[in-house]
């Protein structure tokens, strides 16, 4: 089935659920959870709960906006434009596009690095080329191919987390010291004798962990740009969103809780220690636990690359849709499977540039670019909250006063977090990100896309 955008509406509710879930469960949980625990101590549990609530408020607003639209257009702009206007919608689309472009180049470097660890002796650029070709091919095939791939990649990640939860609960119940876990409760992180306090590094440590956790959830909003390719989006999107909060908190909070109770503080407080996932799997007796976790990390990062190609191509397509220029028509061209072929190729081109730079420069430059605009995802969340508030107050029957108040509180809190990020980031990174935002804002021209203006068409 097609819609007014020309794209094929073939995404189902199960795809949207896994896209949101997969976007929030990245390599950070498998690789970086130990570092977050070391920074915040037991207070990291509160960080995950608060971040999960923030995400739910944002996604709840997305669901309401989708329900109250009859014509579902592609891209982030298609969701927010009816509420905050075309100019700010244009800004949101390009900031979102720039953010995902950074994700593309950073995650390509990341997945190539981990593949090199698994398969030593192969040049890094070879892995980068494989990732670039595979990710581009999946997205060019069809939106259903992309959705099915993401569904099963997310399924694997969820299955590993469920396995960890089952093993962790089993170990807590039997409290089996001979497996290498600490049986004496005096050695566990939750006691005052080992962890100095609920937040060992004070408020700054808690705040740092909160920032990391909030933006590790970036990608869940991907559901917002799938509306043009979703079967019955008014039903599918809200249904998928309703389950986000419980799933996110369960798949993050429960594993972290188990890490805190099963591993001694001296181990979980060491930021250079092995992944807690690998540690628990190894001590249970699962062979090659470190290799298994590396494979899961590769899957998680490739999933991010795959999603980034989808997000950037749809944002680009939404910006040039309806253009009468030569470049606009070319970029708006759809394949026989109703996917924006040229928009995908342009968006994924950066991956092939990454292949060359992996062979010459390594990934240092790309890590700088990724770090410099990684917090721009908060701008998109803020705009989604503003758009939701406009809907709530314009159509008072949409929701009750509690939801309006909660959305306003989250908006203020997220804005403060964003300001603190700018202050605490190195000034070079903040300036670079500011330039991206200014270009996105001032590039707007009514009924013209940035592509048209760039080529003076």
Swiss-Prot record:
What UniProt keywords apply to this chain's record, in alphabetical order? Answer: Amino-acid transport, Cell membrane, Membrane, Transmembrane, Transmembrane helix, Transport
Please give, as recorded in its UniProt entry, the membrane topology of this protein: Multi-pass membrane protein
Give the domain of life.
Answer: Bacteria
User: Coding gene?
Assistant: fywP
Query: Upon deletion of the gene, what happens?
Result: Deletion of the gene reduces the efficiency of growth at low concentrations of the aromatic amino acids.
> Coiled coil: present as a keyword of the record?
no
Q: What is the role of the protein in this entry?
A: Involved in phenylalanine and tyrosine uptake. Also has affinity for tryptophan. Plays no significant role in the excretion of accumulated phenylalanine.
Q: State the family named in the UniProt similarity comment for this chain.
A: Belongs to the amino acid-polyamine-organocation (APC) superfamily. Amino acid transporter (AAT) (TC 2.A.3.1) family.
This protein's GO cellular component annotations are: plasma membrane
Which chain regions cross the lipid bilayer? 16-36, 43-63, 91-111, 114-134, 154-174, 205-225, 243-263, 292-312, 342-362, 373-393, 403-423, 424-444
Name the record gives this protein: Aromatic amino acid permease FywP
Places the protein is found: Cell membrane
- Name the GO terms of the biological process aspect: amino acid transport; transmembrane transport
Q: What is its main location?
A: membrane
Q: Which organism is it from?
A: Lactococcus lactis subsp. cremoris (strain MG1363)
Q: Which InterPro entries match?
A: AA-permease/SLC12A_dom (IPR004841)
